[in-house]
Curated annotation (Swiss-Prot):
This is Securin-like protein. The keyword Zinc does not apply. Residues 31-53 are annotated as: Disordered. The gene is ify-1. Forms a complex (via C-terminus) with separase sep-1. Interaction with ify-1 stabilizes sep-1. Also maintains the complex in the cytoplasm during interphase and recruits it to chromosomes during the first meiotic division. Interacts with E3 ubiquitin-protein ligase etc-1. Acts as a chaperone and as an inhibitor for separase sep-1. Plays an essential role in maintaining chromosome cohesion prior to meiotic and mitotic anaphase, in cytokinesis and in organizing the spindle and the centrosome. Ubiquitination-dependent degradation at the onset of anaphase is likely to activate sep-1 resulting in the proteolysis of the cohesin complex and the subsequent segregation of the chromosomes. Also required for cortical granule exocytosis.
Amino acid sequence: MEDLNFEERGSTQIPASLQQHFSAKLGRQNELEKTPSRGGLGLVVNSSKTPGGKSLQSLASACKVPPSTKKNTIPIAFECYEDETDDQIADVATIKKTEKHPCSPIDTANRCETFDSLAADIEDDMLNLEDQDVVLSEDRPYGDVIDPAESEAEALAELGVEEWDSYPPIDPASRIGDDFNYVLRTEDFAEEGDVKLEETRHRTVIADIDEVKMSKAERNELFSMLADDLDSYDLLAEEANLPL
């Protein structure tokens, strides 16, 4: 039985599962035969012919321990401080102060020559400072503070208007007339109408009818006044309701 070759016997090939079964019966070691199988995208994937071969392969790959690299550890030291009991003061690092050396005007101009287009003028001003002429001008410089009262007085003086001693003036009309040569006459104000008070009899508020005794004539006069008022209100209401 050991010399029998199941693949060469017969006209049909024995399935791999049956061949492995016979080999197991004969005591031979089962060898996993792998054949390339083509996937749907044209890729060749090696798969085992035995049932559960893929799961065995995945299990074997999962049991492999990946190689580990040893990393050098950095020792870290910790130190605890107690703020309440520790009186030690940490040393403060001293900061070196840069000494400022005096620089001559010529060196300053030489350094500015490569960076400033006015280096020649700066050098000339520094070397010939005493030879400069001082020009005095009567114009007011722009940087000075201008007093508004002074500027107002100058503006009034240019216009020929006399400056008021106090503000507001007591008689502005007469002062303005004097300043601008206006002649004020009483005839100019004659067109203004005078206020005239009209004398008429106002109604009396009646608090108690029993206390106020009115004659028949006075009662009729009061009723006529009320009727006139009602008529006037009716006329106003009619005018308001008229279409435009």
